Amino acid sequence: MTELKLIHIFTDGSCLGNPGPGGYGIVMNYKGHTKEMSDGFALTTNNRMELLAPIVALEALKEPCKVILTSDSQYMRQGITTWIHGWKKKGWMTSNRTPVKNVDLWKRLDKAAQLHHIDWRWVKGHAGHAENERCDQLARAAAEASPTQIDEGYQAES
């Protein structure tokens, strides 16, 4: 069996107003090469952007990889490493028997993660971590660029 490529991925999400215009930022490092990605949406939430960032990054990988994925989102990290197992057993319901929020993105993240060996790491945001700060800049710039793209899965709280 061949050795899997080791990719370092850093992600962040941003939202102005929450809900409001939002964006995500991604920095990917592989053997000294860096790739940056970002995009914005007209109306979304911070949590949706925190989920979409790792989804886009993982879906961009062309083959199974060993991934160290670092984010400042406890919501995303806790969800994908801990909460998701219970949600799936309960038919995507929370322990309070309410539907899981952002279920479209959780399902997509779960599917994207299955293809890779991922070490999910957390870093404190706005604490001088270079790649996280760059992701924050990319995400904020995407949110501030008057995005027109629609976040199809966003549903306003009723």
From Swiss-Prot:
Residues 3-144 form the RNase H type-1 domain. Gene3D superfamilies: Ribonuclease H-like superfamily/Ribonuclease H. It is an enzyme of class 3 (hydrolase). One of its GO terms (biological process) is DNA replication, removal of RNA primer. Mg(2+) 2 binds at D12, D136. Endonuclease that specifically degrades the RNA of RNA-DNA hybrids. This is Ribonuclease H. The gene is rnhA.
